[in-house]
Amino acid sequence: MLTRLFSEPGLLSDVPKFASWGDGEDDEPRSDKGDAPPPPPPAPGPGAPGPARAAKPVPLRGEEGTEATLAEVKEEGELGGEEEEEEEEEEGLDEAEGERPKKRGPKKRKMTKARLERSKLRRQKANARERNRMHDLNAALDNLRKVVPCYSKTQKLSKIETLRLAKNYIWALSEILRSGKRPDLVSYVQTLCKGLSQPTTNLVAGCLQLNSRNFLTEQGADGAGRFHGSGGPFAMHPYPYPCSRLAGAQCQAAGGLGGGAAHALRTHGYCAAYETLYAAAGGGGASPDYNSSEYEGPLSPPLCLNGNFSLKQDSSPDHEKSYHYSMHYSALPGSRPTGHGLVFGSSAVRGGVHSENLLSYDMHLHHDRGPMYEELNAFFHN
């Protein structure tokens, strides 16, 4: 088709335009490369197709040379660019390998006197904050040690033991509130001592008036010696009662005055001496101290002593004196020797420091405490 177009005489006038246009395009790349330009085509004749024949191969050769030259330039440029990139990457790797040992830490600036003063001031402030934080933590742990059911003047619980005991104590109280039942002393101590060390377990058992050896033996038992309700068997412990009034209340049950038929409890030999003494004093089998004026005052809100709630009775300062179990009943005939000398204040003794007050806040007055104290005796015999 191209040969036919160039051979037609009607298109001869357009051929020089294509030739001159091709020469104009080829001038710039040839001048850039430094090659000698081809000779200009001869001027067209008056009417012969000679100029068409002479001009026909010129644009084709120019276009083919230009395309070949451009392709070579592109290939050389691509190869050169790839080589430069590879060289730059190799140089970067070499520089990185050479600089790695130098970048192990931040560059230390020169410590001036002002910077030293600022650093010292920041360190002092940080030390003060840490000291205050530890003081607050120790104060909070001391307050926590006061409310957990484990107190000793000679032994101090560690921080982790205090937190574990507090967690167990909160769990035990939540279980008591959830069930609404009076807890068994052995199971209560087992709940408190879960996850604690042996010294802490012994301390908790001693604070709750439970023999640690009996506690360890009863842990594997199937519930023998526990509180099963009215008429159940009870195990005696060689510890005295924490309240000296419990013996008188037990004697009321032995004499048949305080609802002894409702609870078939085991009586003890030392109650008979108390009963005869109180009957001779005119108390009708009850302790004469219950009729004194110091028990007529109103009851104050319950207090928490060593983790156990107790009801404190307000009284005048004249009646504030200390009661000792062995001193109070040592002169009585047939009195039972005590294994421990527990000293309680008058308010603590009259309030009945025991764990049974945990749920029974509606305590009766002292002249109506027979059945309740029978249950307390049964609880502490477990």
Curated annotation (Swiss-Prot):
PROSITE patterns: BHLH. Residues 50-59 have a biased composition (Low complexity). Residues 121-173 form the bHLH domain. Residues 1-129 are annotated as: Disordered. Residues 78-97 have a biased composition (Acidic residues). The keyword Zinc does not apply. Transcriptional regulator implicated in neuronal determination. Mediates calcium-dependent transcription activation by binding to E box-containing promoter. Critical factor essential for the repression of the genetic program for neuronal differentiation; prevents the formation of synaptic vesicle clustering at active zone to the presynaptic membrane in postmitotic neurons. Induces transcription of ZEB1, which in turn represses neuronal differentiation by down-regulating REST expression. Interacts with TCF3, TCF4 and TCF12. Interacts with CDC20. Efficient DNA-binding and transcription activation require dimerization with another bHLH protein. This is Neurogenic differentiation factor 2. The gene is NEUROD2.
